[in-house]
Amino acid sequence: MASRLLLNNGAKMPILGLGTWKSPPGQVTEAVKVAIDVGYRHIDCAHVYQNENEVGVAIQEKLREQVVKREELFIVSKLWCTYHEKGLVKGACQKTLSDLKLDYLDLYLIHWPTGFKPGKEFFPLDESGNVVPSDTNILDTWAAMEELVDEGLVKAIGISNFNHLQVEMILNKPGLKYKPAVNQIECHPYLTQEKLIQYCQSKGIVVTAYSPLGSPDRPWAKPEDPSLLEDPRIKAIAAKHNKTTAQVLIRFPMQRNLVVIPKSVTPERIAENFKVFDFELSSQDMTTLLSYNRNWRVCALLSCTSHKDYPFHEEF
């Protein structure tokens, strides 16, 4: 198992990263420090997580202690939906760089294809509770992302939560300068994403799987929701390999040539989640896990279903 995947800009992206969505600011500094000590070299961030400053403190400390060099780290962040206007993209990226205390990002993603009205609110809502869209389009936003590469602020650019038609739109953009390096999507045994993954990989786009454990700490979880970590069928596969369910759920995307970014702020779990390079799921295990697909999404962005660029009305 290669520990890094080659991106279309020539960079090598660590196949396993630490996710920081929902990591409380008071805990994320310690989490990132532990992760780097344990061997993680890829940290997945975003402006909307409201903890990039604290992530940056941890990165700086580890650089200062010479535990790691900057060029060994792979730092990812994301452009939030309220910054899709061409004139706002660079400032949003600079804010992230300043919070993370870095000169450049290894990868910068458009977080969602849906542009929102600019302003202080991350989710600007109208009277009926729907998100207020911006009149931006994906291609203009992409052109502004390309400028960040030319200016040296980011090494690679990509997308997140884009369906295959939206990916195709970028690939067919007149005057396209840089292809998306990555599409980061939700992916786990209940949402296996075969068609979208096959499409992206056929175009030389690496896929990152987020919420590989089903995001059990999501604020909107309902008691009747299915639980990957408690699924007896997945527990059985884990027992067979003498591994935890989480380790199986992290290894599963890796064997599909996906990058995977499990989130934890618990030192023991951060270390446990990294111990996935010393075993292999059989092809039977892989087929079995793929068969559990039920097209169940943790992140459906339901406040945006009427947005013109809402990604999940399409089959893939």
Curated annotation (Swiss-Prot):
Effect of residue 78 to M: Reduced glyceraldehyde oxidoreductase activity
Gene3D superfamilies: NADP-dependent oxidoreductase domain
Effect of residue 111 to N: Reduced glyceraldehyde oxidoreductase activity
Modified residues (N-acetylalanine): 2
Amino acids binding substrate: 111
Protein name per the record: Aldo-keto reductase family 1 member B1
Subcellular location(s) of the protein: Cytoplasm
Site (Lowers pKa of active site Tyr): 78
Tissue expression: Highly expressed in embryonic epithelial cells (EUE) in response to osmotic stress.
Chain positions found as N6-acetyllysine: 95, 222, 263
Stated regulation of activity: Cys-299 may regulate the kinetic and inhibition properties of the enzyme, but does not participate in catalysis. Tolrestat inhibits retinal reduction.
Pfam families reported for this sequence: Aldo_ket_red
Record note on what altering residue 44 to N does: Reduced glyceraldehyde oxidoreductase activity
Name of the top EC class for this enzyme: oxidoreductase
Cellular component GO terms, alphabetical: cytosol; extracellular exosome; extracellular space; mitochondrion; nucleoplasm
Subunit structure comment from the entry: Monomer.
Annotated keywords: Acetylation, Cytoplasm, Lipid metabolism, NADP, Oxidoreductase, Phosphoprotein
